[in-house]
Amino acid sequence: MMVIRPVERRDVSALMQLASKTGGGLTSLPADEATLTSRIERALKTWRGELPKSEQGYVFVLEDSDTGSVAGICAIEVAVGLNDPWYNYRVGTLVHASKELNVYNALPTLFLSNDHTGSSELCTLFLDPDWRKEGNGYLLSKSRFMFMAAFRDKFNEKVVAEMRGVIDEHGYSPFWESLGERFFSMEFSRADYLCGTGQKAFIAELMPKHPIYTHFLSEEAQAVIGEVHPQTAPARTVLEKEGFRYRNYIDIFDGGPTLECDIDRVRAIRKSRLLDVVEGQPAPGEFPACLVANENYHHFRAMLIRTDPDTQRLVLTAAQLDALKCHAGDRVRLVRLCAEEKTA
C-alpha cells in the first residue's frame, strides 16, 4: 500500500538513493548527505513549531507500507525569500521605436525579479523511475494540497512551483551555457550543487543586474525559455490541471518555468471535503481514484483509494485505516483526482 508520510531521520539513506537518480537539475535534492540530513532536521523542527516562518519547510516521502521502501519525495517551503533573496527572471518586453526611421522593435527581455518573495513553494518533487506507475505520481504531487487544505493557516496566499528546465543527460543546459555561465564562470552542475547545498551568496554577488535581451542568447537557449525537462512534463500537466499557470517567470539557472496559483483556487484544496470514516468492506463497483488524508498534523498520512467521491460516509478496510493512522469515527479529507487522470 503506497502512503505519504512526514520525513524521518531514518530516511536519509533512501533520500541519497533518490538523489542519485535525478539526473541533475533538481537543485533541492543534491546527492549530499549533510545537506539532506540538515533538510530533514529543518522539517522536523518545522513540525515541532521551533522555527520562524521564514525558515519553515515540510518534507514528505512516498512509502510502500508493506516493505518500508521509499519511492519518492515531495516538499513545501512555507515562505520563500524572507531570509535569502529568491530570484527568478520575468520575461517581459522592451520596445525600441523610431518614427523617423520607421522602425519598431518589441524585444523579449529578461528582468531580474524577487516578485514571489513570501510565497509558499511546492518543491523537491521526485519519484523513483521504478515506481512511476499506478497513480504514484499523482499521489506524491497532490498529497501536498491535502496537507495545505487541512492546515491552511500555515501557508501564504500564493503558491509557486519551479519546474526543472531543459537539461540533457550529460548535464548540459542551453540556457545556462548561453547566459549563466558567462556571469558565474562555472559549469551548470557546479552552480546547481552550490545552490542545493545552501551556498547561495554567489548568486547575489554574480547575477547580472540589468535587463537582458533574449535575442542576444543562442537560438537553442531562446527555444528552452519557459520549457520543462521531458521527465518534468507530467508534473507540469498535473499542476496545470489543478489551476497553476505560467506567468512569464523562469528559473535563473536553466530557464524552466515557474508556475503559480492562489492557494484557495487550487482545485484539490477548493474541492476537498471532510467526512466521517467507518470500518468495513467498501462497496464493489467501478469508482474513480480519490485522494484521502487524515487531519493529523504530526502524523499526516495520504493515499489513493477508489470510492464514490460524493459519498457522505467513507468506508475503509482495517488495513486502510491503519495505513492512514486513523480510526472509525475520525474525520478524513477526500477529493477526486481529475477525471482524465488514470491510475492504471
From Swiss-Prot:
GO MF entries: arginine N-succinyltransferase activity
Reactions accelerated catalytically: succinyl-CoA + L-arginine = N(2)-succinyl-L-arginine + CoA + H(+)
One GO term (biological process): arginine catabolic process to glutamate
InterPro entries recorded: Acyl_CoA_acyltransferase, Arg_succinylTrfase_AstA/AruG, Arginine_N-succinylTrfase
UniProt-annotated catalytic positions: H229
Spans through the membrane: none
Binding site residues for succinyl-CoA: L125
UniProt KW keywords: Acyltransferase, Arginine metabolism, Transferase
Record EC number: 2.3.1.109
Protein's pathway: Amino-acid degradation; L-arginine degradation via AST pathway; L-glutamate and succinate from L-arginine: step 1/5
Pfam families registered for this protein in UniProt: AstA
Record flagged with keyword Transferase: yes
Annotated function: Catalyzes the transfer of succinyl-CoA to arginine to produce N(2)-succinylarginine.
NCBIfam families reported in the protein's UniProt record: arg_catab_AOST, arg_catab_AstA, PRK10456.1
Cited PANTHER family: ARGININE N-SUCCINYLTRANSFERASE, N-SUCCINYLARGININE DIHYDROLASE
Family affiliation: Belongs to the arginine N-succinyltransferase family.
The protein, known as: Arginine N-succinyltransferase
Phylogenetic lineage: Bacteria, Pseudomonadati, Pseudomonadota, Gammaproteobacteria, Enterobacterales
Gene name of the record: astA
